[in-house]
């Protein structure tokens, strides 16, 4: 058991393949610390990966089951329209907790500014 004063959750059920209340998506983000053009956020459930490019609004969708190396971008393919819509909504839900510079009126917002570091990064405090 996880001690009550320890932050986090036990991964035991997850690694044993048992039913577990765990988040549905893994979040990935890239800031502009290396390149001004490389500012995005992505969500994946391990089967599908959705990428939202903050500065351009470009969406990318990859079918990781068929294309684990992400060589075929599927956002414009009619066969993936439902998955694109679902993943876009998941990103809206994910980013909505931040502020209106990320999501406004239920839609993703193209950002003109960037953050080089997380708000919790020691240099920003």
Predicted regions mapped to residue ranges:
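C-terminal cap/loop subdomain of S1 sulfatases and analogous C-terminal strand-loop tails that border
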Residues: 1-60, 64, 82, 98, ...
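Phosphate-coordinating loops and pocket residues in cytosolic domains that bind phosphorylated ligands
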Residues: 13, 73-76
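Intrinsically disordered, low-complexity polar regions and short flexible loop motifs
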Residues: 67
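Short, conserved loop/turn and helix-capping segments at secondary-structure boundaries
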Residues: 77-81
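A short, conserved beta-to-alpha structural element at the edge of catalytic cores
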Residues: 90-99
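Basic/polar N-terminal segments that are highly enriched at the extreme N-terminus
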Residues: 123-125
């Amino acid at each position: 058991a996880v001690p009550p004063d320890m932050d986090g959750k036990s991964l035991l059920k997850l690694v044993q393949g048992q039913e577990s209340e765990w988040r549905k998506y893994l979040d990935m983000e890239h800031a502009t610390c290396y390149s001004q053009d490389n500012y995005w956020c992505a969500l994946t459930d391990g089967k599908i990966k959705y990428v939202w490019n903050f500065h351009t609004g470009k969406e990318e969708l990859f079918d990781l089951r068929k294309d684990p190396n992400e060589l075929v971008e599927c956002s414009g393919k009619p066969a993936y329209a439902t998955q694109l819509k679902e993943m876009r909504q998941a990103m809206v839900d994910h980013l909505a907790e931040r502020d209106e510079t990320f999501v406004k009126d239920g839609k993703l917002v193209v950002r003109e500014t960037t953050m080089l570091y997380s708000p919790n990064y020691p240099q920003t405090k």
